[in-house]
Amino acid sequence: MDEQEIQRLVEEVSLQYFGMPFLHKAMFNSRLRTTGGRYLLNTHNIELNYRYYEMYGKEELVGIVKHELCHYHLHITGRGYKHRDKDFRELLKAVDAPRFCKRMINEEKGKKVYMYECMECSLQYVRRRQINTKRYVCGKCKGKLILIKKTS
C-alpha cells in the first residue's frame, strides 16, 4: 500500500463512517514505533504506522484510521477531541472504532544474551548485559571469567 492508496482509504472511511470529507493529507510515518497512528493538530494531517498494516492487515489499519478520524473531525468541528473527552468516546462507539490498537509484536528486537564461564570452577553465568571480564571475577571461587557464547 502506497501513499495514494492510504489517502484514498482515509477519504473513503471518512465519508462512509462520518459523512464528512477528509480534506488533509494521510501518510505513513516509518518513525512511529509503539503507536498505530497519530493526528497532528497543527497541520490536521494523519500519520499511520506501516508496520501495523504489515503485521495485522487492512482491517486493523481501518480501525486505526477510524480512531484518528475521530480526533480529526472533532477537532475540526471544535468539540472535545482528546481521549478523555466525552464527545470523543461517544464518537468512537458510534463508528465502532477501537480505543486502543493491538499490541505490536516486536519480533525483530531479539534479546542479547551473554554466557560467561569461570575458568576455575566451570560455573556458568548468563547475563543480558556485557561485563568487563578483566574487572569482574567469579563470585564463587574468584576465578577468571571468559565469554563463551553471545546470542542476539
From Swiss-Prot:
The active site is at 68. The keyword Cytoplasm applies. InterPro entries: SprT-like_domain, SprT_Zn_ribbon, Uncharacterised_SprT-like. GO terms for biological process: response to stress. Zn(2+) binds at residues 67, 71. The keyword NAD does not apply. Residues 7-148 form the SprT-like domain. Its cofactor is Zn(2+). It comes from the Bacteria. Keywords: Cytoplasm, Metal-binding, Zinc. GO terms for molecular function: zinc ion binding. It is found in: Cytoplasm. Transmembrane segments: none annotated. Its main location: cytoplasm. Binds 1 zinc ion. One of its GO terms (cellular component) is cytoplasm. NCBIfam families: PRK04351.1. Belongs to the SprT family. This is Protein SprT-like. It comes from Bacillus thuringiensis subsp. konkukian (strain 97-27).
